[in-house]
């Protein structure tokens, strides 16, 4: 391990715990045994774990130093792609850690999870009401999963009509994952450029919308942080050709409770736990990507 010189400034040089190993050091002492020992066969216990010998203060200082070098929303702006990363109130994390939620095993029988099931059922109603949609599913495990679920709903809707549409309109201001979700559903993405104001124009959508197009994927507010003020006219154009309007909720926290997505022409909308609401985005979770739909798509949930 390279030694740090006596210089000023921040030195990001922290050895691994195994490199700090000092034989004989101990961070925790067990009480003296008051019964006879009974050594177990090695086939049962396995090899002795390769844990380093460290004192408690060695471990505390190690992780404290590493935590001070970490960067996140508590220490500065977090511009991760097009995602809206914001400060998360600590009280929300405390509620999420309530034992009834955090301690419930996924395989518990329904007779032992009625409280959690009731909460989830009521949450579906709350999300439908605040978004202006008609039905909600909480099944998608994260935003990208919800996005894919939304596109599969559009695919299933057209299939039920005997229509095999092959294209989907994806604006240049849409969430970057949209083309991937469209591709997984067998759609070919048709790009549309935003206008000089950074939003979609109805004319640009009308030019590419036809009866081979399943719909449009709109992020609203878009990746530039601008509300798509022409969304009603755009939705009318798409609907007139039999298409559906999908809205990516990556930036929905800006308009949640303000814009009624159902009234402005959205057919399917996905939300993000870590963007629309306030759970930290890190380490791959925890995630949730509820999908909200209008009445015509409810049978396909």
PLM region descriptions:
Residues 1-103:
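N-terminal glycine-rich, Lys/His-bearing helix-loop that initiates the first secondary-structure elements
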Residues 11, 16, 52-70, 99-141, ...:
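Conserved N-terminal alpha-helix of the aminotransferase class I/II PLP-enzyme fold
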Residues 31, 136, 149-152:
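Acyl-CoA thioester-binding alpha/beta core of soluble enzymes
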Residues 43-44, 97-111, 129-133, 183-193, ...:
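Gly-rich Lys/Arg/Thr-decorated short loops/hinges at beta-loop-alpha junctions or inter-strand turns
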Residues 66-77, 108, 130, 134, ...:
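Short secondary-structure junctions and interdomain/linker hinges
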Residues 71-91, 139-147, 277-292:
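Conserved phosphate/anionic-ligand binding catalytic regions in large, soluble enzymes, centered on
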Residues 75, 137-139, 160-162, 166:
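Short, surface-exposed helix-loop/turn micro-motifs enriched in polar/charged residues
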Residues 115-118, 145-301:
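Conserved PLP-enzyme active-site core in the AAT-like
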């Amino acid at each position: 391990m390279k030694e740090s010189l006596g210089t000023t400034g921040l030195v990001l040089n922290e050895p691994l715990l195994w490199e700090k190993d000092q034989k004989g050091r101990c961070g925790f002492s067990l009480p003296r045994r008051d019964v006879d020992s009974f050594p177990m066969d090695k086939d049962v216990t396995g090899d002795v774990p390769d844990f380093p010998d460290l004192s408690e203060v060695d471990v505390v200082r190690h992780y404290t130093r590493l935590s001070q070098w970490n960067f996140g929303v508590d220490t500065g702006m977090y511009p991760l792609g097009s995602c809206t990363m914001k400060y998360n109130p600590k009280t929300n994390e405390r509620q999420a850690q309530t034992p009834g939620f955090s301690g419930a095993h996924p395989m518990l029988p329904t007779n032992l999870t009625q409280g959690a099931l009731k909460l989830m059922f009521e949450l579906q109603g709350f999300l439908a009401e605040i978004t202006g949609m008609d039905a909600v599913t909480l099944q998608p495990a994260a935003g990208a999963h919800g996005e894919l679920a939304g596109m599969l709903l559009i695919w299933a809707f057209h299939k039920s009509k005997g229509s095999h549409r092959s294209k989907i309109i994806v604006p240049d201001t849409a969430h970057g994952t949209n083309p991937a979700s469209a591709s997984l559903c067998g759609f070919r993405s048709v790009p549309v450029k935003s206008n000089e104001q950074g939003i979609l124009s109805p004319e640009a959508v009308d030019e590419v919308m036809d009866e081979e197009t399943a719909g449009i994927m709109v992020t609203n507010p878009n990746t530039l942080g601008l509300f798509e003020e022409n969304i009603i006219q755009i939705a009318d154009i798409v609907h007139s050709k039999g298409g559906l309007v999908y809205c990516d909720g990556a930036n929905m926290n800006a308009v949640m409770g303000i814009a009624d997505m159902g009234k402005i022409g959205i057919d399917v909308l996905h939300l993000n736990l870590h963007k629309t609401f306030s759970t930290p985005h890190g380490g791959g979770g925890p995630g949730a990507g509820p999908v909200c739909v209008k009445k015509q798509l409810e049978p396909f949930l």
